[in-house]
UniProtKB/Swiss-Prot annotation, chain A:
This is Exocyst complex component 6B. It is linked to Spondyloepimetaphyseal dysplasia with joint laxity, 3: An autosomal recessive bone disease characterized by multiple joint dislocations at birth, severe joint laxity, scoliosis, gracile metacarpals and metatarsals, delayed bone age and poorly ossified carpal and tarsal bones. GO terms for cellular component: exocyst. Residues 260-280 are annotated as: Disordered. PANTHER family: EXOCYST COMPLEX COMPONENT 6B, SEC15. Keywords: Coiled coil, Disease variant, Dwarfism, Exocytosis, Protein transport, Transport. It comes from Homo sapiens (Human).
Swiss-Prot record, chain B:
The lineage of its organism: Eukaryota, Metazoa, Chordata, Craniata, Vertebrata. InterPro entries: P-loop_NTPase, Small_GTP-bd, Small_GTPase, Small_GTPase_Rab. This is Ras-related protein Rab-8B. It comes from Homo sapiens. The modification Cysteine methyl ester is found at residue 204. Phosphorylation of Thr-72 in the switch II region by LRRK2 prevents the association of RAB regulatory proteins, including CHM, CHML and RAB GDP dissociation inhibitors GDI1 and GDI2. GO terms for molecular function: GDP binding; GTP binding; GTPase activity; signaling receptor binding; TPR domain binding. Switch 1, switch 2 and the interswitch regions are characteristic of Rab GTPases and mediate the interactions with Rab downstream effectors. The switch regions undergo conformational changes upon nucleotide binding which drives interaction with specific sets of effector proteins, with most effectors only binding to GTP-bound Rab. Residues 205-207 form a propeptide.
Length: 811, 207
């Protein structure tokens, strides 16, 4: 029962299926019937299916017959009509055939044309395809050509961009072509070529900025100079300005008289007029002198190529090398200012370029790198300056160098470089400048003193008088009232030295300009330098003149007068310094001027030299003495040499009336003392072994001549007998011997009021021995003459007593 | 004191201010030259010892101020001079014209037998010459005086001038000594007279 149920179920399903298949066969196109039929054979019911199919066929045939029977008459009618149509159709066929034959004949040309058209279209299609292909390839070729052009015209950065574009955008589209493969292979080479050429450009650039460093630096320094000039005009203080102008006017007045010691510096220190400023050329900037584009392009190229770090390292390395070259001073830099200027220009140019690159690139150079370079540059520059400036012996050059260094420092400061060490070094150079100035002024003073005529300055007109008074602060109402011609008491070197001291002060001040020192510092510095000038340089110059061999009394006397006036002028120099440095009068100066000491010392030296000079003249006369120590004759006048000597002294003191009173008195006293001492030595010297009373008489006449001179008052101002005291020793000795007053001498010896207080027993004995020897020599004759014997006995007695005195004095 | 010389000759330099008297003396005594003109005040002297015919001769050379204001003082030295040099400047005609005045001064104040000599100084400055050598020579001949052109700067003829004058003084002195000896031989009274004169050269010769 279950078996039958199952079979029934399967049969129903199959029947439905077969029904569906039959419907599909009836409705589906022939092309798709395959799958349908295959589904029948896939199963196992194709027999039953065939039965169903046969059944359906018979049904359909039966229906067809029914239909045919129903439509039989119509069918017959139709057949009849068809037979008619057949005839008509035959006619139509013939007609169509004719028409066709005609068309064929007529359309043969058209067919040919159509064939040609077909060929053309094919060709056109090919062309179009070719064009499409080429359209893909053409941009690549164009780009490559452009690349080549850019390489040729050395526009490497665009070339690199083109290369990148070509590689990543265009070539992938046409990578299967052989020529494209060749291009792809070439790209690395081209890239390397761009790299190399860019590096070459960079090297050229580096060479260019090295060559133009000098010009760039010069330009920057000029700009800084112009800026300073503008600042000076704005900040100019009326007081200083008018004072400087007054000084210039003074120079104009004395142009033919005063030789400027610093013409160049004087011009440098002048304040530019606004008109002059306007006339200046427009100074080009650094970027106008150098083309920086190569470095920018190269930087970009290396950045694109991924080698930026390599580029940065190379650039910095090369610039460090160039820095060392720039910082190497030429061996003869110190000889001229231009040597220094070129050196500074190169350094400034170098750093201006670096600063420019710092601000116009991203990271090629950084602040740390530049600061490191600058630190090296600063230490090397300072070392070089120390070395080379020490060779400078021209103060004008040192001053100009200082101005140049200040300008150098100011220029670099504007670009942000610290320059304090340069100003510190300038203070060192200032000391050297002072030394150089002192040497220069030593020469100046020497020239002034050597060329002076050591005579009072004569003036014949009011104009000349005012000129001298304008140069040197001298006021004398009495002299002013005197009629022309008249004379100033001092000689030419007084106003000249005074003016040169002021010039020295100006020169010191000039160095202090722009050093950012306070006026008090400047004032102290100037005073110290001026003290050195006065206490060392001028002092040495004066001493050298005073100690010079063959200097005459004329010069020495005038020097005394001159130094007196210069000493009085020191207070004016103090005022001059105070005015010139703008230090307030109330300020307590830590440094004072010591000029007065210098002039006092010089005056004392000159005075001493006068005494020495006079004494030397006296010695020369004494060398002419020709006493006949054995003469028996009694003369009646002084020796020739002594008369000449006294006449010389008399005339000397007579003509040097302008010698200060005390100096004249001291000189006269010194001369008399020297003369007295020399005469005494002459009398007592060992070479004179014997002498006679006659010789003593002659000697006495000479001493009297001296005393006469002393009494005559050759120099005013002496107390009545002060000068005579110089000869008192000689006088008493000679009186003792000539008057043979031994009893008085021996009796009174040691008494405070004795007549021969100044006669030394040793001296007396020495002289007595010389007389005894004389007598002893004539001993044989003396025996025959009672007087001679008595005299000899007396001499022996006195000698014995003198020896006793000497012995007791010693014990 | 032992004498270091045989004779003492006193010479005098006179002439206008600025002709070079001091420079001539400086050249002769120190062999140096000072370009700066320093006007002599009053009187000065230098001593130099020379040798003539084996004799040591001390030349005491007085240098006088040429300015008028010192005339009284300088004139006082004429009497003692044994030789006088009259100096003019060849570049200054006025100083040459004044030689006549200086000669007149000598005749008035110097001893009658003083030896004289004319010097035309600064002969190195030929480009500024105002007085020809011939004129100088003629003037000297007119007065029976020797003449030399000198240059203190270049030292031309300076030694020659002083030695010439000294030699002339020596010649005159020797002549006097010969005359004295001859007279002395004639009688003792004259010898005594000579000694009483006390002239320095005479006394030296006795020693």
């Amino acid at each position: 029962m279950e078996r039958g149920k199952m079979a029934e179920a399967e049969s129903l399903e199959t029947a439905a299926e077969h029904e569906r298949i039959l419907r599909e066969i009836e409705s589906t196109d022939t092309a798709c019937i395959g799958p349908t039929l295959r589904s029948v054979y896939d199963g196992e019911e194709h027999g039953r299916f065939m039965e169903k199919l046969e059944t359906r066929i018979r049904n359909h045939d039966r229906e067809i017959e029914k239909m045919c029977n129903f439509h039989y008459q119509g069918f017959v009618d139709s057949i009849t009509e068809l037979l008619k149509v057949r005839g008509e159709a035959q006619k139509l066929k013939n007609q169509v055939t004719d028409t066709n034959r005609k068309l064929q004949h007529e359309g043969k040309e058209l067919v040919i044309a159509m064939e040609e058209l077909k060929q053309c279209r094919l060709q056109q299609r090919n062309i179009s395809a070719t064009v499409d292909k080429l359209m893909l390839c053409l941009p690549v070729l164009e780009m490559y050509s452009k690349l080549r052009d850019q390489m040729k015209t050395k526009r490497h950065y665009p070339a690199l961009k083109t290369l990148e574009h070509l590689e990543h955008t265009y070539l992938p589209q046409v990578s299967h072509y052989r020529f494209c493969k060749v291009m792809v292979d070439n790209i690395p080479k081209l890239r390397e070529e761009i790299k190399d050429v860019s590096m070459s450009d960079l090297k050229d650039f580096l060479e260019s900025i090295r060559k133009h460093s000098d010009k760039i630096g010069e330009t920057a320094m000029k700009q800084a100079q112009q800026q300073r000039n503008l600042d000076n005009i704005v900040l100019q203080q009326p007081r200083i300005g008018s004072k400087r102008k007054s000084k210039k006017d003074a120079y104009i007045i004395f142009d033919t008289e005063i030789e400027s010691t610093s013409p160049k510096s004087e011009q440098d220190s002048g304040i530019l007029d606004v008109e002059d400023e306007e006339d200046d050329e427009e100074v080009p900037g650094a970027q106008d002198l150098v083309d920086f584009s190569p470095v920018y392009r190269c930087l970009h190229i290396y950045s694109v190529l991924g080698a930026r770090e390599t580029f940065e390292n190379y650039y910095r390395k090369q610039r460090r090398k160039q820095a060392r070259l720039v910082l190497q001073p030429p061996s003869n830099m110190h000889e001229t200012l231009d040597g220094y200027r070129k050196y500074f220009n190169q350094i400034v140019g170098f750093f201006v370029v670096e600063d420019h690159i710092l601000h116009t690139t991203q990271g090629l150079v950084n602040r740390a790198y530049i600061d490191e370079l600058w630190e090296m540059a600063l230490s090397k520059t300072i070392a070089a300056l120390r070395t080379h400036s020490s060779y400078c012996s021209d103060p004008n050059l040192v001053l100009d160098l200082k101005n140049l260094i200040v300008l150098f420092a100011d220029t670099l400061q504007v670009y942000g470089f610290p320059v304090n060490q340069l100003f510190d070094m300038l203070l060192e150079i200032r000391d050297q400048y002072s030394e150089t100035l002192l040497k220069k002024w030593a020469g100046i003073f020497r020239n002034i003193l050597d060329s002076d005529n050591y005579s009072p300055i004569p003036v014949t007109s009011e104009e000349m008088y005012k000129k001298v008074v304008g140069q040197f602060p001298f006021q004398d109402i009495e002299l002013e009232k005197q009629p022309f011609p008249k004379k100033f008491p001092f000689s030419e070197f007084v106003p000249k030295v005074y003016n040169q001291i002021k010039e020295f002060i100006y020169a010191c001040l000039k160095f202090s300009e722009d050093l950012h020192l306070s006026s008090t510092e400047v004032d102290d510095m100037i005073r110290k330098s001026t003290n050195l000038l006065l206490t060392r340089t001028l002092s040495n110059s004066l001493q050298n003149v005073i100690k010079r061999k063959n200097i005459g009394l004329t010069e020495l006397v005038q020097i005394i007068i001159n130094t007196t006036h210069l000493e009085k002028s020191c207070k004016y120099l103090e005022e001059f310094i105070t005015n010139i440095t703008n230090v307030l009068p109330e300020t307590v100066h830590t440094t004072k001027l010591y000029g007065t000491t210098t002039f006092k010392d010089a005056r004392h030296a000159a005075e001493e030299e006068i005494y020495t000079n006079l004494n030397q003249k006296i010695d020369q006369f004494l060398q002419l003495a020709d006493y006949d120590w054995m003469t028996g004759d009694l003369g009646n006048k002084a020796s020739d040499y002594l008369v000449d000597l006294i006449a010389f002294l008399r005339s000397t003191f007579a003509v040097f009336t302008h010698l200060p009173g005390k100096v004249a008195q001291t000189a006269c006293m010194s001369a008399c003392k020297h003369l007295a001492t020399s005469l005494m030595q002459l009398l007592l010297e060992a070479e004179v072994r014997q002498l006679t009373l006659g010789a003593l008489q002659q000697f006495n006449l000479d001493v009297r001549e001296c005393e006469q001179f002393a009494r005559s008052g050759p120099v005013p101002g002496f107390q009545e007998d002060t000068l005579q005291l110089a000869f008192i020793d000689l006088r008493q000795l000679l009186d003792l011997f000539i008057q043979w007053d031994w009893s008085t001498y021996l009796a009174d010896y040691g008494q405070p009021n004795c007549k021969y207080l100044r006669v030394n027993p040793v001296t007396a004995l020495t002289l007595l021995e010389k007389m005894k020897d004389t007598s002893r020599k004539n001993n044989m004759f003396a025996q025959f003459r009672k007087n001679e014997r008595d005299k000899q006995k007396l001499i022996d007695t006195v000698a014995k007593q003198l020896r006793g005195l000497i012995s007791s004095h010693h014990s | 004191m032992a004498k270091t010389y045989d004779y003492l000759f006193k010479l005098l330099l006179i002439g206008d201010s600025g002709v070079g008297k001091t420079c001539l003396l400086f050249r002769f005594s120190e062999d140096a030259f000072n370009t700066t003109f320093i006007s002599t005040i009053g009187i000065d002297f230098k001593i130099r010892t020379i040798e003539l015919d084996g004799k040591k001769i001390k030349l005491q050379i007085w240098d006088t101020a040429g300015q008028e204001r010192f005339r009284t003082i300088t004139t006082a030295y004429y009497r003692g001079a044994m030789g006088i040099m009259l100096v003019y400047d060849i570049t200054n005609e006025k100083s040459f014209d004044n030689i006549k005045n200086w000669i007149r001064n000598i005749e008035e104040h110097a001893s009658s037998d003083v030896e004289r000599m004319i010097l035309g100084n600064k002969c190195d400055m030929n480009d500024k010459r105002q007085v020809s050598k011939e004129r100088g020579e003629k003037l000297a001949i007119d007065y029976g005086i020797k003449f030399l052109e000198t240059s203190a700067k270049s030292s031309a003829n300076v030694e020659e001038a002083f030695f010439t004058l000294a030699r002339d003084i020596m010649t005159k002195l020797n002549r006097k000594m010969n005359d004295s000896n001859s007279a002395g031989a004639g009688g003792p009274v004259k010898i005594t007279e000579n000694r009483s004169k006390k002239t320095s050269f005479f006394r030296c010769s006795l020693l």
